[in-house]
């Protein structure tokens, strides 16, 4: 559903405007209701349409709490989760706790990741892209894909 990346700005009040190319899809998929939370591996924010979040929430809650990595993931995903709604201009407030977690300032990158978005500081996004290891071995799940 969501793909591509787009440079966007955050205003002084901590709001960002969802690009028009995604606004209609969000309106029809969830009435503009989204959930923002911390990414478990990178200093960026995950943005889910609310119905998509409701599908993965039971899976997050079912993670074993005696497993340190699973508990860390729960703390990040559930502890930072914020239900938000786009305003009539397609803007949404990025909560201060998440802005701090992802080191967000005015310049942002919104990255479509299929059923969700990632929101990065522009600087962190380009550093992450530059750090990609093209020689890294593909996961086994991708070896059968024909692109």
UniProtKB/Swiss-Prot annotation:
<dbReference type="Pfam" id="PF02381">
    <property type="entry name" value="MraZ"/>
</dbReference>
<keyword id="KW-0238">DNA-binding</keyword>
<dbReference type="InterPro" id="IPR020603">
    <property type="entry name" value="MraZ_dom"/>
</dbReference>
<dbReference type="GO" id="GO:0005737">
    <property type="term" value="C:cytoplasm"/>
</dbReference>
<dbReference type="GO" id="GO:2000143">
    <property type="term" value="P:negative regulation of DNA-templated transcription initiation"/>
</dbReference>
<dbReference type="GO" id="GO:0003700">
    <property type="term" value="F:DNA-binding transcription factor activity"/>
</dbReference>
<protein>
    <recommendedName>
        <fullName>Transcriptional regulator MraZ</fullName>
    </recommendedName>
</protein>
<keyword id="KW-0677">Repeat</keyword>
<dbReference type="InterPro" id="IPR035644">
    <property type="entry name" value="MraZ_C"/>
</dbReference>
<keyword id="KW-0804">Transcription</keyword>
<dbReference type="GO" id="GO:0000976">
    <property type="term" value="F:transcription cis-regulatory region binding"/>
</dbReference>
<keyword id="KW-0963">Cytoplasm</keyword>
<feature type="domain" description="SpoVT-AbrB 2">
    <location>
        <begin position="81"/>
        <end position="124"/>
    </location>
</feature>
<dbReference type="GO" id="GO:0009295">
    <property type="term" value="C:nucleoid"/>
</dbReference>
<dbReference type="InterPro" id="IPR035642">
    <property type="entry name" value="MraZ_N"/>
</dbReference>
<dbReference type="InterPro" id="IPR007159">
    <property type="entry name" value="SpoVT-AbrB_dom"/>
</dbReference>
<keyword id="KW-0805">Transcription regulation</keyword>
<feature type="domain" description="SpoVT-AbrB 1">
    <location>
        <begin position="5"/>
        <end position="52"/>
    </location>
</feature>
<dbReference type="InterPro" id="IPR038619">
    <property type="entry name" value="MraZ_sf"/>
</dbReference>
<comment type="subunit">
    <text>Forms oligomers.</text>
</comment>
<dbReference type="InterPro" id="IPR037914">
    <property type="entry name" value="SpoVT-AbrB_sf"/>
</dbReference>
<comment type="similarity">
    <text>Belongs to the MraZ family.</text>
</comment>
<dbReference type="InterPro" id="IPR003444">
    <property type="entry name" value="MraZ"/>
</dbReference>
């Amino acid at each position: 559903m969501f793909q591509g990346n787009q440079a966007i700005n955050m205003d002084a009040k901590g709001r960002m405007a969802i690009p028009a190319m995604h606004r209609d899809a969000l309106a029809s998929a969830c009435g503009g209701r989204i959930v923002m939370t911390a990414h478990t591996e990178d200093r960026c924010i995950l943005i889910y349409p609310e119905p998509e979040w409701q599908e993965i929430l039971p899976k997050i809650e079912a993670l074993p709490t005696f497993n340190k990595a699973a508990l860390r993931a729960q703390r990040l995903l559930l502890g930072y989760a914020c239900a938000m709604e786009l305003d009539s201009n397609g803007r949404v407030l990025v909560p201060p706790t998440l802005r701090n977690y992802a080191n967000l300032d005015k310049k942002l990158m919104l990255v479509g990741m299929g059923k969700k978005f990632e929101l990065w500081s522009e600087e962190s996004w380009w550093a992450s892209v530059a750090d990609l290891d093209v020689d890294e071995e593909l996961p086994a799940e991708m070896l059968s894909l024909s692109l």
